[in-house]
Amino acid sequence: MKLYNDDCLDVLKTIESESVDLVVTDCPYHICSGCCSNDAVKIGRYTEPGGIFQKRKDSHGNTYMTDTKHVSLCGIFNDADPTTYTKQGKLFKFNDIEFSDWLPDIYRVLKSETHCYIMINPRNLKELQQSCEDVGFVFQQLIVWDKGNATPNKYYLNAYELILMLRKGKAMNINNMGTKNILRVPNIIKTKQHPTEKPYELMKILIENSSNEGQIVLDPFMGVGATGVAAKKNGQRVHRHRNR
């Protein structure tokens, strides 16, 4: 197992081309927690309400797009004074990383006839899939992770997340062809060490289906390391990177 405690955008460029057998990762994307959504608009890559970054105006009428470089964020910061909180909320780290910053290198380091799994939410799915296809990936399947629990809100409870399954080169069968595309794995609740931590059992299914013992699994955004634990227990070699 190799663990790189460094900026994945730098480390990826040092990995040899076509040296990785599988990528499984939960990448950063533009979202926050605790945000309002009353005046969201669709401007380019910034899409629906509910925590997604929005086009805003400051107290002088100047329009800007909220992101991690501007601390102003809908529902969290006051427009007149961007340093003042108006309600509780938090901005997830590394939201300034674009898909185009790392996907070309992911495609480059993967061998031909391999799979890539990327966790994503519904609002960012379209952009991620397009970005993946732009660098050469072929869409294989959309997998649903049924978390089995959800946080109450005013709409239907959000009890699932999506996993975009891609391939490089020709299609390759998964090892357990009886696996359904709805994976019912309970989410981590009480023992969670990271806001977006994924269960070991979920990573285990993906790794066992798309790689074999001794092969190299890459996770450029390792979080608490569930991908690495699953790969190591299954006999694969793993490269894990921590985000900047």
Regions found by a protein language model. Name each.
Residues 167-171:
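Short loop segments at secondary-structure junctions
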Residues 1-149, 154, 158, 165, ...:
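S-adenosyl-L-methionine-dependent nucleic acid methyltransferase catalytic domains
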